[in-house]
Amino acid sequence: KLVGRDEQSDIALLQIEDAENLTDIEIGKSSDLRVGDFVVAIGNPFGLGQTVTSGIVSALSRANLGIEELENFIQTDAAINSGNSGGALVTLDGKLIGINTAILGPNGGNIGIGFAIPSDMMRNLVQQLIEFGEVRRGVLGVRGNDLNSDIADALDISVSEGAFVAEVVPDSAADKAGIQSGDVIVA
């Protein structure tokens, strides 16, 4: 039975009723991972059936990939292919530390750059699916960029770090709070 799903994070929560002989998996803390740790990816690539591949954690907190709105991925070189999305990324001692979600490669093929949603983030997503049947996200309602010295000079402002507000979405939380286009948020 589908409890809830979140297309944005590529996560679904299922409830299995009247099942016997199932073994649960211990959920590890992805915050304990280090670059270079060995991991195993489990999935169903191309519909071939259960498949296991191995690799290492290549990077942590990968973002700005354009895969999802909120990005904080574990990057691995374990082979993740089409059909592996939703599969487990586990440590060598069998602890779940990520949910395989995407690859970066030509034509959807594996070149050793795969991504998984960290278990620490997954816990929050799953809890929201249990409570609400969906993931609820707060939206500030601004579009902008990091402020740098070039933008600060062009705007003739004294601060050179912060968030430059380029646009405020009408009737958003930011609009209601009085934030305006051209503002710089520094703290």
List PLM regions with ranges.
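Serine-dependent protease modules
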Residues: 1-177
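Conserved PDZ fold ligand-binding element
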Residues: 174-187
